[in-house]
């Protein structure tokens, strides 16, 4: 069963920011990143368990999956009964627990 995808506004902003950052140096790479992110999110809709659980007790239930071809860019998501909730799209060097805590 393919689930619907819900992309939170912060995740959409993350994608825009990373696209712009990559595009400063290489527009072709930025376009590939954007397409790869969309493809990876589509893959989540078909196989939500493909990602790994985030190893942090304060982020229970959150999973992550690297963007295909851009392994340092991670999609963080929650699996719901009928949909996939894309929470953030961040570079692996970012401190996710601190980012999430600051939003609450």
Q: What do the predicted segments below correspond to?
A:
Residues 1-62:
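Basic, Lys/Arg-enriched alpha-helical interface segments
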